[in-house]
């Protein structure tokens, strides 16, 4: 209902928000494997290579704009906490404006983006020119849906900030299922090859925007009516501060990209076998820790609503912190135990039974202890990312990420000459620990500042940027 304020965070309510978000995080990559299976049965190895290369470009491009989901989540949660329906909808208008603008810029710059992808992934690698042409075909079709993809990201952030992670899961699942069905139709039945695969995904992404629009209509109907509480003037007035928030989250995300790319690049110095082992273990870590996204999103929601609340802020903050920490700690411990017990079996499943699989598995097992402890190392960073996003203090996320990245570089430089690839893994583990430790150190000061300031902005900007 329109006047509803923030819900107190309990273990039950936090889990109710966290589990659909966790499932949404893992549904897309799991069902995305269907695309590879379909193309493997309906096209040749060149098409499969082109789809893999194109998918890598798309992943980096779209993931870089994930800041829009995070910023809209924190901002909408704060507006909900303050019971400001006009501001809540103004943030959606801002997000859609930014999303469509960025999406159309990507569409306009499609040719330079494709050329850059070709240069980085084909010209400097062993990939064939045929695979490069297949990648270009794939990207030209996929990028047509860029405005829909980025705008949908904004819609999903707006919904998650209100705790509507059930809708997040439903939309994400629908996109994946539509994609899988259209892939089977276009590739296996109509024999359209890589262009058909790309078209299936692009159409599914457009359908996702349509479903997101229906979700917005449903939620606004529940919160006072579809036609009420919209204000373009309010959306324009706060746009500068929203852009600053998005900038800081983008920088934070870019720094993570730099660290992960540096990890891959530094590992290449140890030879092909170590590169393969590092690739397997890193992708395993990134996949299993997706489950931690759910509690992090719950933290965004409850901390954001506590930030916007006009009464009992301190109690709401403490409850949000405490209950989401319980869930993320339990999930991290569960993932740690699963990796510790089933690591050998998991490696056999991932690597398969190819001609070099046994040596790759043996090499990966040498460094598996680092991967086993990674869920525990990253848990605090995940939860505190959600806490700081909910408090819309992305400036601290940016600064602590920069310091953590410098620590990663220093540890890698000092340890790799002494202990080789183990030093690289130690640097990554310390990077994850530093993220959490630095955010934990910054939190008391940020909490004290945010409790006394206005909705949705860092305290230094609240008084001048928010509409009165």
Annotate each PLM feature:
Residues 66-70, 141-160, 168-176, 197-213, ...:
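Short runs within selected transmembrane alpha-helices of multi-pass transporters and secretion channels
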Residues 48-108, 152-161, 165-168, 277-341, ...:
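Small-residue-rich hydrophobic transmembrane alpha-helices
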Residues 33-36, 154-158, 180-185, 213, ...:
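Alpha-helical transmembrane segments of multipass membrane proteins
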Residues 33, 42-45, 79-82, 161-162, ...:
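Helix-loop interface residues and adjacent transmembrane-helix termini in multi-pass membrane transporters
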Residues 255-259, 263, 268-272, 289-296, ...:
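Hydrophobic alpha-helix feature that most strongly marks membrane-spanning transmembrane helices
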Residues 1-21, 76-147, 178-181, 187-247, ...:
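Short alpha-helical transmembrane segments in multi-pass integral membrane proteins
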Residues 36, 45-48, 85, 165, ...:
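Membrane-helix interface/capping residues of multi-pass secondary transporters
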Residues 19-74, 145-149, 240-305, 331-335, ...:
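Transmembrane helix-bundle signature of multi-pass secondary active exporters and lipid flippases
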């Amino acid at each position: 209902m329109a006047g509803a304020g923030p819900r107190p965070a309990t273990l039950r309510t936090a889990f109710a928000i966290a589990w659909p978000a966790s499932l949404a995080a893992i549904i897309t990559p799991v069902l995305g494997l269907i695309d590879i299976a379909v193309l493997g049965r309906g096209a040749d190895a060149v098409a499969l290579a082109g789809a893999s290369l194109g998918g890598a470009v798309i992943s980096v491009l779209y993931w870089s704009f994930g800041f829009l989901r995070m910023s809209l989540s924190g901002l909408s949660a704060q507006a909900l906490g303050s019971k400001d329906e006009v501001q809540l909808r103004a943030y959606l208008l801002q997000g859609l404006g930014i999303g469509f603008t960025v999406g159309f810029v990507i569409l306009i710059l499609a040719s330079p983006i494709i050329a850059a992808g070709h240069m980085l992934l084909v010209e400097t690698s062993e990939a064939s020119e045929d695979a490069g042409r297949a990648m270009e075909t794939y990207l030209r079709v996929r990028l047509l849906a860029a405005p829909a993809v980025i705008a949908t990201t904004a819609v999903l952030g707006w919904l998650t900030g209100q705790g509507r992670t059930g809708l997040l899961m439903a939309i994400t699942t629908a996109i994946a299922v539509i994609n899988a069905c259209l892939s089977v139709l276009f590739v296996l039945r109509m024999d359209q090859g890589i262009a058909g695969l790309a078209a299936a995904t692009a159409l599914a992404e457009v359908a996702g925007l349509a479903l997101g629009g229906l979700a917005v209509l449903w939620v606004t109907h529940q919160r006072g009516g579809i036609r009420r509480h919209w204000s373009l003037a309010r959306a324009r007035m706060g746009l500068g501060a929203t852009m600053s928030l998005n900038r800081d989250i983008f920088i934070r995300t870019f720094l993570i990209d730099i660290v992960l790319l540096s990890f891959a690049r530094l590992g290449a110095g140890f030879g092909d076998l170590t590169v393969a082992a590092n690739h397997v273990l890193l992708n395993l870590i990134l996949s299993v820790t997706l489950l931690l996204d759910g509690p992090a999103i719950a933290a965004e929601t409850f901390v954001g609503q506590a930030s916007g609340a006009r009464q009992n802020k301190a109690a709401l903050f403490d409850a949000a912190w405490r209950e989401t920490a319980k869930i993320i700690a339990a999930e991290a411990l569960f993932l740690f135990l699963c990796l510790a017990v089933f690591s050998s079996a998991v490696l056999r499943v991932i690597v398969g039974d190819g001609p070099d699989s046994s040596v790759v598995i043996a090499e990966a097992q040498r460094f598996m202890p680092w991967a086993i402890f990674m869920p525990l190392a990253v848990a605090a960073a995940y939860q505190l990312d959600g806490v700081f996003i909910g408090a819309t203090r992305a400036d601290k996320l940016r600064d602590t990420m920069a310091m953590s990245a410098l620590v990663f570089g220093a540890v890698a430089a000092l340890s790799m000459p002494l202990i080789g690839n183990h030093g690289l893994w130690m640097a990554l583990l310390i990077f994850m620990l530093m993220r959490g430790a630095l955010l934990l150190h910054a939190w008391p000061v940020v909490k004290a500042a945010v409790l006394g300031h206005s909705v949705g902005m860092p305290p230094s900007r609240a008084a001048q940027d928010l509409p009165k």
